[in-house]
Amino acid sequence: MTTVTICLRGGLVHRDSDGRKQVFGAEILSAKKNDDGPYGGKHTQWLTFGKGIVHELMFDNMRRRGQLGHRGTSILHQELYQIWVDLPSAKRMVNPRVELLGGEDETPTVEHQGTTTTVIAGEHYGKAASVDLTSDLTILRVEMRAHSSWKHNEAKQHGTMIIYMRTGSILIGSQIVSAHCTAHLTSDGDEVKIIAGQEGADFLFLSGKPLGQNVAARGSMVAGTNADLEKAFADYESGDMGTPWSERYSDNDWRTHVAKYRKTKMKP
């Protein structure tokens, strides 16, 4: 699987068994210009688990913008989307990969007649996200002013389309979709047309070409079959994916833990 984590409010801290630490957040998700800000302009993480990795993703409750403090001393409002994207079967056992995205070069915005569309994956009206996709899909965050209209030319092969309403309401054909509701659409290659309600709208648009393959899940593991799941749990127990650490570990303790694990694994 790949998880796509889009931070809408607050911030997140990632650490993993390959020794990577990443911090990303929401300050400029809808910004008009590239701006480093406290999170370096990054608001979205793509984490491809592939053959397996141990990781933690914690809310960034640290005082930022130059203030002194430690995690937990300042509680921020937090809100995010996390989307699980299946990998094609031929690519399920790739090496783990983590990528942060943000800004016009990586997640461009399209502004048109009262609407703002942030392209997280795929393309919208000639602007494409930079992430290298393993399958044919589109992820858009759409913000609309009251009574504005939004259109999207969807690929005919995208048999699956989903809209999740964060706030406000929209009209699709004769159907009203309200906040916190999900609309499932079919694609025939025509243009998707949406009109915002009197309070405007903020929604997530997802579409993709169906992979038509099995998915098995248990606990924190996702694989293709039950046999693959058993192999994944065995790999985890043996330490092939990394060894867990306490979320209370400081960065120094975590790095020492990861370095010790790597050193152990390198022995014949």
Question: What annotation goes with each model-predicted range?
Answer:
Residues 1-268:
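Jelly-roll (double-stranded beta-helix
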